[in-house]
Amino acid sequence: MDNIRRVGEIYQCPVMITEVGFEVDESRPEVLAEGKRQLLRVLRESKSETNGICRGVFYLEPECRPSQYRLGAFTEDVHPTIIMEAFSEMR
């Protein structure tokens, strides 16, 4: 989060983290769990370690199928994976 703070301070503006994504492999639940853990870490750190400079986190293409883009957050039959739970856990 040092870079987020640095960019905000240099340009005197709020910053967003854009285009995050984590691997979706429906056959490996541990991969999905790790994606959720990492997204939750990014969300928490962006809120607690940026002195209010970070205004949000944008997940790139969460609804795409893994066969189209491996870093989405939905299953092949277009249902959300546990990765998306990270957003609701931040409320």
Residue ranges of predicted features:
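A cross-family glycoside hydrolase active-site/sugar-binding cleft signature
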Residues: M16-G21, F58-L60
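Aromatic-rich peripheral "rim/lid" segments of glycoside hydrolase catalytic domains that contact
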Residues: R6-E9, D25-R91
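Active-site neighborhood of glycoside hydrolase catalytic domains
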Residues: D2-V15
